[in-house]
């Protein structure tokens, strides 16, 4: 339920634009972040341990061990198709990258979300547009970013 409420709040408060094509990894990743008490009640639960979504972490680790997450970040950046073909993988990687960015590159992540919400109404973004927009905020070494994300997620206790 908190996940769906997070979507509504994000759209109602302008974090996402209802009239724009929001990359699904962005909206679902943010909603999965909000499923934890450390995000929705951060004053009472300020520890990073309270911000870790344990079920998403377990899912990501299981899928990674099975070799199903490697290279999927670029795929998510290019299109939303992975949510149709392998939704568990899509949600796991969306949570992992969102958690990594929120914990390690928060200013850039917030800037990305802010600018994504202002990209214009009723625009369809090509695969190149979607990746280019991400690269402008986080750099062109997507493979390196994915490696750093994996190291970070693997380090979580």
Description of each model-found segment:
Residues 1-12, 31-32, 98:
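Active-site recognition of the HExxH zinc-binding catalytic motif
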Residues 18-157:
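Acidic/His/Gly-enriched intrinsically disordered linker/tail segments
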